[in-house]
Amino acid sequence: MKNIVIIGGSKGIGNAILLQQLESNMVYNISRNAPTITHPNLKHFSLDVLQYALPEIENIDTLIYCPGSINLKPIGSLSIDDFRNDFEINVIGAVKTIQNYLPVLKKGTNPSIVLFSTVAAKLGMPFH
């Protein structure tokens, strides 16, 4: 049984990964909102990774960062604060999380880190 930490596992892709991994792994979910299920292999920490210290987790094999944030507006409608907020969530949050858990992760079984992005970064969207 692996120990998997998911940042953003309460909704979307993060939640789908959480549900897929629960039967055969211990899953630690860190998100502002709790997942809609309970399971003996699930431990949830309700917090914003940018605002609070991350919880101590003793054993980690996989770290998955998928906070799910994007501003789909025309660039002229985005404020500097919009850009700053997205950067904080998608870059600073990922770096903070990796730095916090890297020492523990290095001790894991075949450790891995998975960072999710948005399709808009690759695909391009009109007026975005």
Language-model-detected regions and their locations in the chain:
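N-terminal Rossmann NAD(P)H-binding glycine-rich loop of SDR-like oxidoreductase domains
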Residues: 10, 14-19
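Conserved glycine-rich Rossmann-like NAD(P)H-binding loop of the short-chain dehydrogenase/reductase
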Residues: 25-37
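Active-site loop of short-chain dehydrogenase/reductase
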Residues: 60, 105-117
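Conserved NAD(P)H cofactor-binding loop of Rossmann-fold oxidoreductase domains
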Residues: 67-72
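Substrate-binding pocket helix/loop in short-chain dehydrogenase/reductase
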Residues: 74-75, 82-84
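A short, exposed helix-loop element centered on a Lys and neighboring polar residues
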Residues: 98-99
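Catalytic loop of short-chain dehydrogenase/reductase
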Residues: 112-128
